[in-house]
A protein has these predicted regions:
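Binuclear metal-dependent hydrolase catalytic cores
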Residues: 1-171, 177-180, 184, 256-279
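Cap/insert and terminal regions of metallo-dependent hydrolase folds
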Residues: 169-171, 177-274
């Protein structure tokens, strides 16, 4: 199984980082987990065309995690010779989001149907949506997945995914604080991908901003680097993969971020720029 951090950014715009998105490749499947701003461009940089993505897993409905979903859907539809709908698996509410997105894209679809006979013959732009919750399971080709509860309150629901292929396990959490559901999802995983923030840097930034309370509010519903490392150690994870860096990680700060994790977790800690990857 190969994990590629397509986007390691966050809601804070960063010219060096796309929004939250992770690519998992296993058993001939290309699976995107979340689809933040710029994810499609990073997908191409990873050598994967939109039509090669079979499924997008969505952890929760915060805008920074789904901004590029419409681009993924449209690009697949326009570029593929055969209309194969994207499969989107996410928490309750994702169907309404996709329906609204398709309504937004209706004029574009009509323009393209009017201009391209073969595209019109392929049929309408559609998406296969599956709403899931903790305890549910699914398959993507030879990859099996289970759904686990995470804690991003007041965001409800929020979920994570445990993907397995040929004895290897990758656990992927979106935004969450440590909780039993994440521990269960990560148990003995070969890799655990966690979005993180730096409490110390966020607090300092909040103190410097006139509307700093808004920044300070995010401290209570994200995992810190240290907490992610503690979860990894507690769950017996082999590799800890960090992403969604808040505030944006500046070049040269990697060792500082990694040191906060290695103080609590003895295994490999993977972090870095977009397109950083690991195979397990």
């Amino acid at each position: 199984m190969k994990i590629t951090l397509l986007g390691t950014g966050s809601p804070i715009p960063d010219p060096m980082r796309a929004g939250p998105c992770t690519l998992v490749q296993a058993g001939g499947q290309n699976v995107m987990v979340d689809c933040g701003r710029g994810a499609l461009m990073r997908l191409l940089a990873a050598g994967v065309f939109p039509g090669m993505v079979s499924t997008c897993l969505v952890t929760h409905l915060h805008s920074d995690h789904i901004t590029d979903l419409n681009d993924l859907v449209t690009s697949r539809w326009v570029m593929m010779p055969v209309n194969v709908p994207l499969r989107v698996i996410g928490p309750p509410g994702i169907r309404a989001v996709v329906d609204a997105m398709l309504q937004m894209l209706a004029p574009d679809q009509q323009y393209r149907h009017d201009h391209h006979d073969d595209l019109r013959a392929n049929g309408p732009l559609t998406v296969n949506v599956e709403e899931v919750g903790p305890g549910d399971s699914f398959t993507i080709g030879a990859v099996s997945g289970t759904v686990h509860e995470t804690d991003h309150r007041p965001v409800r629901p929020s979920i994570g995914f445990r993907l397995e292929h040929e004895g290897k396990v990758v656990a992927l959490a979106g935004d969450t604080v440590p909780c039993d559901g994440v521990d269960e999802m990560c148990h003995n995983a070969d890799a655990y991908v966690q979005t993180v923030i730096r409490y110390d840097l966020v607090s300092a930034l909040a103190d410097a901003l006139p509307n700093g309370q808004r920044m300070r509010d995010i401290l209570d519903y994200h995992s810190s680097v240290e907490q992610a490392a503690q979860t990894a150690a507690r769950a017996g994870v082999k590799n800890l993969v960090l992403t969604h860096y808040v505030p944006p990680m500046a070049p040269g700060q990697e060792d500082d971020w990694k040191a906060q994790a290695t103080a609590h977790f003895s295994g490999p800690v993977i972090l870095g720029p977009d397109l950083t990857s690991i195979e397990v």
